[in-house]
Amino acid sequence: MNECSRRPFYSEYAWAFDLLIDRPVRKECAVIAAWLVDRGALPGSEILDAGCGTGRYAIELARRGYLIQGIDLSPDLIEVAMRSHGDVHRGVSFAVGDIAHLPSSRYTAILCRGVLNDIVDDAGREAVFAAFAGALQTNGVLILDVREWAASVERKAREPLFRKRVSTERGELTFTSVTAIDHETRRLLISERHELLTSGEERVSEYNFVMRCWERDELDTLLARHRFGELSYFGAYDSGVAAGATDRLVVVAQRTGAAA
């Protein structure tokens, strides 16, 4: 799992992460907060943002009254998050940490966005779900999202290339990602390239890595094994988007019994 923290995206270019990946954070956090309240996790509850990245979701949820702890394997992303929390410093904290090793029965809810695709082995996936179950209080809420295999194959076969160019204080930055599909292992083979042009000099970083997509049956099995029930599936952080409508699976679940 430490492999992820070596990606230039998460290390030397962590400072540019939010420039390259634009998410509707406030809109999605409004939905997340509504789901939390619906499951009994009210403002004032302690929530873990597992794999928090630059902390934007943690900070927004703290503004909505939650007590948020964000952890990530990348020290560089955590450094960005700690510089960004601004006026909500009393409601949010950040630390380098491993989502497979969590304190027992501490949290009312856990949020895990886009992280679980980076765990490619069965044992690692099992360990993370065991950690989530152990870290949640009884009736605690788990909200996560993953890439769904069949829809991801369809999308990446149609759109294998992603490129974005942004102007930054450090120069012109071009990010390119190319995805190939390994059907046999149900994995995405991804090649990333950062090109930073500063004062006529170009710096290039390249990195290849693997993502393993998910299928709903696998999620159902792991959630049931670790005593999660009351499952709701969506295709986005939007109650109006049905599962299967996008290449994402968003799951809201509740820990219904003692951890396995």
Residue ranges of predicted features:
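Class I SAM-dependent methyltransferase SAM/SAH-binding core
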Residues: 55-100
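A short glycine-rich, Lys/Arg-flanked "PGG" loop and its adjoining helix->strand segment in the class I
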Residues: 126-138
